[in-house]
Amino acid sequence: MLKHLKQVDQEVFEAVSKEFKRQQEHLEMIASENYTSYAVMEAQGSVLTNKYAEGLPHKRYYGGCEYVDIVEDLAIERLKKIYGAEHANVQPHSGSQANQAVYFSQLQAGDTIMGMSLAHGGHLTHGAKVNLSGIVFNAVQYGVNPETELIDYDQVYKLAKEHKPKMIVAGASAYSRIIDWAKFREIADEVGALLMVDMAHYAGLIAGGAYPSPVPYADFVTSTTHKTLRGPRGGFILSKAQYGKDIDKWVFPRLQGGPLMHVIAAKAVAFKEAMTEEFREYAHQTVKNAKVLAEELKAEGLRIVSGGTDSHIVLVDLRPLNVKGNQAEEALGRANITVNKNAIPFDPEKPMVTSGIRLGTAALTTRGMKENDMRRIAKNIVKVLKNLDNEKIIQEVKDDVLSLCSSYPLYPEWTEYYLD
């Protein structure tokens, strides 16, 4: 394994090897990251990368697709079974492209959409001005209540009544609480809007029964496959049957060309894994870990946005320690704890500075970590945040992190190949 890469391109091999070591020796706490299984990576690295397969299964524009058809059929049927969906398209290369396909399948340029503000925890593709969704469409943004820091459903209702959007978008990238999908459906119905849910962050938790499913309520559900779902990097779309043909033609040929069949194979494997009892246990443990992490950080003097979490996400307000998000990200990185700076609702700081950090427990849980490990990690995080420039303290934390990581080895079967 990797011997050919090492022989052909030493520079790339060395970069890959160093990244393998970084993943082994760091606590991965970026909420959108996770570790795929050996099987998922083997599927993605298979000969399917050589095959063009424009079109849909059994309706291809190329010959020789009989075996990739089997793979895509498996991915579609497994995905529909996991979420109880009527229609599924597994070809989107990313969550962003999945969202674009839904928008363009139903909307015209200039139509009004409503999505959660990026500044309050939404995603770029939900109508942010710098994104295509906010350029092509008239985007109205809702947010959280300043007191509770929970989605302000009264505001959502008022904005919907005022602006009459053709589509309402629910879902977020930095919102830790349960989203009331039924409430969004009720509001959408009242104003005659379609409802799209972007469940990218929560998809794995939903598959494992640890977070409510939006599928019974939404006309369209989009997602990535690589966050809590633990698959390869990619996307998918679920929809009511009546929208299936529109979705399919907007994914191909209107937005994409040939699907990535090696990635679709990896998606199929990940979907099979997501139907196991082991995956269900992982999903519930991920939420348990996040709750313990949040409580421990609160006990150490930090403020948790909204007061806690119902998911894998913990959004931390650093202002009680007079620390900025970019400072925290950099210092924690020196201690081998990988996080990302993140705006908090009503943040006075600039986006590249921020007053907060976003933490996630999915990758740690995949490694096998549990509640006591979260308590240990929380104490180390706070120790760094209180000693940003104390290299002795940061080294002590790094040593403890290395010890913890060694107790939960990552890809042990591959170590000799990557670190040869």
Swiss-Prot record:
<feature type="modified residue" description="N6-(pyridoxal phosphate)lysine">
    <location>
        <position position="227"/>
    </location>
</feature>
<comment type="pathway">
    <text>Amino-acid biosynthesis; glycine biosynthesis; glycine from L-serine: step 1/1.</text>
</comment>
<comment type="pathway">
    <text>One-carbon metabolism; tetrahydrofolate interconversion.</text>
</comment>
<comment type="subunit">
    <text>Homodimer.</text>
</comment>
<feature type="binding site">
    <location>
        <begin position="122"/>
        <end position="124"/>
    </location>
    <ligand>
        <name>(6S)-5,6,7,8-tetrahydrofolate</name>
    </ligand>
</feature>
<keyword id="KW-0808">Transferase</keyword>
<dbReference type="Pfam" id="PF00464">
    <property type="entry name" value="SHMT"/>
</dbReference>
<keyword id="KW-0554">One-carbon metabolism</keyword>
<keyword id="KW-0028">Amino-acid biosynthesis</keyword>
<feature type="site" description="Plays an important role in substrate specificity">
    <location>
        <position position="226"/>
    </location>
</feature>
<dbReference type="InterPro" id="IPR049943">
    <property type="entry name" value="Ser_HO-MeTrfase-like"/>
</dbReference>
<dbReference type="InterPro" id="IPR015422">
    <property type="entry name" value="PyrdxlP-dep_Trfase_small"/>
</dbReference>
<dbReference type="InterPro" id="IPR019798">
    <property type="entry name" value="Ser_HO-MeTrfase_PLP_BS"/>
</dbReference>
<comment type="similarity">
    <text>Belongs to the SHMT family.</text>
</comment>
<keyword id="KW-0663">Pyridoxal phosphate</keyword>
<dbReference type="InterPro" id="IPR015424">
    <property type="entry name" value="PyrdxlP-dep_Trfase"/>
</dbReference>
<keyword id="KW-0963">Cytoplasm</keyword>
<protein>
    <recommendedName>
        <fullName>Serine hydroxymethyltransferase</fullName>
        <ecNumber>2.1.2.1</ecNumber>
    </recommendedName>
</protein>
<comment type="function">
    <text>Catalyzes the reversible interconversion of serine and glycine with tetrahydrofolate (THF) serving as the one-carbon carrier. This reaction serves as the major source of one-carbon groups required for the biosynthesis of purines, thymidylate, methionine, and other important biomolecules. Also exhibits THF-independent aldolase activity toward beta-hydroxyamino acids, producing glycine and aldehydes, via a retro-aldol mechanism.</text>
</comment>
<dbReference type="InterPro" id="IPR001085">
    <property type="entry name" value="Ser_HO-MeTrfase"/>
</dbReference>
<dbReference type="GO" id="GO:0019264">
    <property type="term" value="P:glycine biosynthetic process from serine"/>
</dbReference>
<dbReference type="GO" id="GO:0030170">
    <property type="term" value="F:pyridoxal phosphate binding"/>
</dbReference>
<dbReference type="GO" id="GO:0035999">
    <property type="term" value="P:tetrahydrofolate interconversion"/>
</dbReference>
<dbReference type="InterPro" id="IPR015421">
    <property type="entry name" value="PyrdxlP-dep_Trfase_major"/>
</dbReference>
<dbReference type="GO" id="GO:0004372">
    <property type="term" value="F:glycine hydroxymethyltransferase activity"/>
</dbReference>
<dbReference type="GO" id="GO:0005829">
    <property type="term" value="C:cytosol"/>
</dbReference>
<feature type="binding site">
    <location>
        <position position="118"/>
    </location>
    <ligand>
        <name>(6S)-5,6,7,8-tetrahydrofolate</name>
    </ligand>
</feature>
<dbReference type="InterPro" id="IPR039429">
    <property type="entry name" value="SHMT-like_dom"/>
</dbReference>
